[in-house]
Amino acid sequence: MITKEMIDRINFLYHKSKSEGLTEEEKEEQRRLREAYVKEIKERVKRELDNLFADASHHHHHCHHHEH
């Protein structure tokens, strides 16, 4: 789950990378945090789209059924 702390940390590392640079450990942490963040966003979008298409499919069949 994406927490406020995760986002704060991503932002902190981003700004630090721009101002003074990151250590190798921080670069690795930043990479892992970003991967986790992107993975969760993708899963969230996929779930929403699956729900959307499931609803659309349900409504389509439902409407189609009434035509007969």
Curated annotation (Swiss-Prot):
<dbReference type="GO" id="GO:0005737">
    <property type="term" value="C:cytoplasm"/>
</dbReference>
<keyword id="KW-0963">Cytoplasm</keyword>
<dbReference type="InterPro" id="IPR009242">
    <property type="entry name" value="DUF896"/>
</dbReference>
<dbReference type="Pfam" id="PF05979">
    <property type="entry name" value="DUF896"/>
</dbReference>
<protein>
    <recommendedName>
        <fullName>UPF0291 protein TTE2340</fullName>
    </recommendedName>
</protein>
<comment type="similarity">
    <text>Belongs to the UPF0291 family.</text>
</comment>
